[in-house]
From Swiss-Prot:
The modification Phosphoserine is found at residues 120, 238, 463. It comes from Mus musculus. Residues 562-594 have a biased composition (Basic and acidic residues). The gene is Nyap2. Residues 489-510 have a biased composition (Low complexity). This is Neuronal tyrosine-phosphorylated phosphoinositide-3-kinase adapter 2. Disruption phenotype: Triple knockout mice NYAP1/NYAP2/MYO16 are fertile and appear healthy. However, compared to wild-type mice they show a clear reduction in brain size, exhibiting a reduction in the size of the cortex and striatum, but not the olfactory bulb or corpus callosum. The total neurite length of neurons in these mice is also significantly shorter. Activates PI3K and concomitantly recruits the WAVE1 complex to the close vicinity of PI3K and regulates neuronal morphogenesis. Residues 98-271, 407-682 are annotated as: Disordered.
Length: 682
């Protein structure tokens, strides 16, 4: 700037100023050029360095690759290109390139199924046959065994010294080949032994374990067998222990197994691996055979012991369980059939035929199942009006002609209305018997089945319990019998009306009940009043009372039945009128006759229910008297007709009687019916 000012001041100085300016500009240009050159040089240098390093890295990489390839090629030449297969995992290119070679040689190896290693071994053997480098030829098998190169190198080094000689001598000792180790067959055999056959392995182990360096590999392999042996021995021992506990004969089988395993394995150490498995397998097979023999112990073990318990139970409580099972309203049709066909003792045998768990369940279940069985036999349809005609027809089947005429006449009016309800109640109270008797042209046999069922099932179940099913069906004969006769007398007129009422179970019994009650009220009012007070409120109480009074009742019932028989016929006729009720009482009396001797409890229940039901109910509590049945029978013969008439009128009137009255009437009716059934039976 100064020069410019000066120039401005002194125009002469302009050339100098311009000169300086020019110099300055040139210097700046040179400087800029240098800077740029420097920068470019620096950049170029950096690029060069970068490229050099990169190239060096690439060169190193390439060199490494080249070396690897060279080594692979060299190894392939020595061991055979099959060896490349082992490297295939590491060096993909070479592996793929060389892979075809081992594949081409696949036919050579004895075991083409082996992995690439085994193939490579065999292929190596083939190549080595061409090249006579014995020391190198032996090592390849080891790499096959262990694909690690270290093993091969170590084997090579060792083999170079004495391994080749020892290997040859060993192979000769084996007797496989006297050919020097350079030949592939011995090598293949040694290498093959590792994989294919335990026998060859044992030989290799024995021969090479001591002199060969391979012994290290063998020793490595040997330890695993030992653990196998130990676990196997433990397994076998635990196996044996568990089975020895269960079956002593197992011990004999174990020695057998050990001997077999020893026989199978000429060389104990190497083959113990397999023998162990063989031993285990043999034991298992033997165990399975034994288990087949003792299926109950193993497969059905759980069921087997329960079965024995059940058998013991049955033998001990023969009568108890069977009376209970048959008595329990659990009456399955088969149960009833059994009882009917084979008598009191047969039910047990038949029950035993059923798989063991079921009889036990039935014996314990009965009180709960009491009600269902009745429904099963008394289908809802059977309870309904359609049964009324069946009942009417059933009366003729019963063959009480004189009274049957009356029931149809008297019942026609009442039967239509309450006939269905009557049938329901009767079927319900009597249990499945009514339906069966109705359906069967010959009521007595089915009734016999059902009678056993009803006396046992109902007394035991004591369907007096208020459950709706029990209300409909389960008014047990006991409950019906027990109510005091004097109540029944009053309800005699109401019985029919009550029967018209759909839910009053006693109605069906009430007709006959009223008749019987009128006859027996005078004689038994006092006794039954006592018994009524005793009538159990709950099924359990009834059961307890039944069992307590059972034995005494059984003794007295036999005499009671005999006394009742003469007069029972008239009562039986009355029972015929009570269509659905009658078949059961008859059956009860029959069954009582059959079962009285066979099972104490069954007869007791049957007698309570059947033979002595009316008064005996009282007497059963009080001690049954043979006289009461006779009196009852006499009363029945004299008064039942009147009571029936009353019952019909009441039913016609449709006056609903108290439920208690129907129950009492039913009880009276059943009482009278039981003697009548006894008479019919006799």
């Amino acid at each position: 700037m100064i020069p410019s000012k000066m120039m401005s001041a002194n125009p002469e100085e302009d050339p100098l100023d311009t000169f300086f300016q020019y110099i300055e500009d040139m210097g700046m240009k040179a400087y800029d050029g240098l800077v740029i050159q420097n920068a470019s040089d620096i950049a170029r240098e950096n690029d060069r360095l970068r490229n050099e390093t990169k190239l060096a890295y690439l060169k190193e990489k390439n060199e490494k690759r080249r070396r690897q390839e060279e080594t692979i090629k060299r190894i392939g030449g020595e061991v055979g290109r099959g060896q490349d297969a082992s490297y295939a995992g590491k060096h993909f290119r070479m592996g793929f390139m060389t892979m075809p070679a081992p594949q081409d040689r696949l036919p050579h190896p004895c075991s083409s199924g082996f992995t690439v290693r085994s193939q490579s071994l065999h292929s190596v053997g083939g190549t080595e046959d061409d090249s006579s480098c014995g020391s190198r030829r032996q090592p390849p098998p080891k790499p096959k065994r262990d694909p690690s190169t270290k093993l091969s190198t170590s084997s090579e080094t060792v083999n170079s010294t004495a391994a080749s000689k020892s290997g040859r001598s060993l192979e000769r000792a084996e007797g496989k080949f006297t050919v020097p180790a350079s030949h592939s067959p011995p090598r293949a055999s040694t290498s093959g032994h590792l994989f294919p056959s335990p026998g060859s392995q044992e030989r290799n182990i024995k021969v090479s374990a001591k002199p060969r360096p391979h012994s290290d590999e063998y020793s490595k392999k040997i330890p695993p067998p030992k653990p196998k042996r130990n676990p196997n021995t433990q397994l076998s021992t635990s196996f044996d222990e568990t089975y020895i506990k269960k079956h002593v004969p197992r011990r004999t089988s174990l020695p057998r197994d050990s001997s077999l395993s020893q026989v199978c394995s000429p060389a104990a150490d190497p083959e113990e691996e397999e023998p162990v498995y063989i031993e285990m397998v043999g034991n298992i097979l033997r165990d399975f055979r034994k288990e087949e023999d003792d299926q109950s112990e193993a497969v059905y073990e759980e069921m087997k012991y329960p079965i024995f318990d059940d058998l013991g139970h049955d033998s001990k409580c023969d009568f108890d369980h069977h009376s209970c099972s048959s008595q329990c309203a659990t009456p399955t049709v088969p149960d009833l059939d059994f009882v009917k066909s084979s008598g009191p003792c047969t039910p047990k045998g038949l029950l035993c035929d059923i798989p063991p768990p079921f009889p036990n369940l039935l014996s314990h279940r009965p009180p709960l199942l009491v009600f269902p069985p009745a429904p099963v036999h008394c289908s809802p349809n059977s309870d309904e009006s359609p049964l009324t005609p069946l009942e009417v027809t059933k009366l003729p089947v019963l063959e009480n002609v004189s009274y049957m005429k009356q029931p149809p006449g008297a019942c026609p009016s009442s039967l239509p209305s309450h006939g269905s309800s009557h049938a329901k109640d009767q079927t319900g109270a009597l249990g499945p018997a009514p339906g069966a008797s109705i359906l069967s042209s010959s009521p007595p046999p089915p009734s016999t089945l059902y009678r056993t069922q009803s006396p046992h099932g109902y007394p035991k179940s004591h369907s007096t319990s208020p459950s709706p099913v029990s209300m409909g069906r389960s008014l047990t004969p006991l409950s019906l019998k027990r109510p005091p006769p004097y109540d029944a007398v009053h309800s005699g007129s109401l019985s029919r009306s009550s029967s018209s009422v759909p839910h009053t179970t006693p109605r069906p019994v009430s007709q006959d009940g009223a008749k019987m009650v009128n006859a027996a009220v005078n004689t038994y009012s006092a006794a039954q009043s006592g018994s009524r007070s005793r009538t159990p409120t709950s099924p359990l109480e009834e059961l307890t009372s039944l069992f307590t009074s059972g034995r005494s009742l059984l003794r007295k019932s036999s005499s009671g039945r005999r006394s009742k028989e003469p007069a029972e016929k008239s009562t039986e006729e009355l029972k015929v009128r009570s269509h659905s009720t009658e078949p059961l009482p008859k059956l009860d009396s029959k069954e009582r006759g059959h079962y009285g001797s066979s099972s104490s409890r069954e007869p007791v229940k049957a007698q309570e229910w059947d033979g002595t039901p009316g008064p005996p109910v009282v007497t059963s509590r009080m001690g049954r008297c043979s006289v009461s049945p006779t009196l009852l029978a006499g009363n029945h013969s004299s008064e039942p007709k009147v009571s029936c008439k009353l019952g019909r009128s009441a039913s016609t009137s449709g006056v609903p009687p108290p439920s208690v009255t129907p129950l009492r009437q039913a009880s009276d009716l059943q009482q009278s019916q039981v003697p009548s059934s006894l008479a019919n039976r006799d």
